[in-house]
Regions:
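Residue-level recognition of oxygen-bearing side chains
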Residues: 50
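RNA-contacting regions in translation and RNA-metabolism proteins
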Residues: 1-43, 53-77
Length: 77
């Protein structure tokens, strides 16, 4: 899941070298923290939050297939 999210987010942003994704698996729960350059926050969030909602939806579907609960956070680095 980490590789897919990294690929998608790096394709959107202007500073792909500043994208960092940390994934922690805690039994039935996965926590993913995405960090991007402050200038790229708007691009990742998208108009009305459409981009980040689509990314979250896709990540949640993958988590459901693995029978895990997912926590996804987006922060500036």
């Amino acid at each position: 899941m980490k590789k897919l999210l990294e690929y998608l987010i790096k394709a959107i942003v202007d500073h792909p070298d500043k994208v960092k994704i940390d994934e922690k698996n805690l039994g039935e729960e996965s926590s993913i923290k995405i960090r991007v350059h402050p200038d790229d926050m708007g691009k990742v969030i998208g108009k009305g939050g459409k981009i980040i909602k689509a990314i979250r939806r896709m990540a949640y579907i993958l988590a459901i297939k693995k029978k895990k609960r997912l926590i996804l956070e987006l922060n500036e680095s």
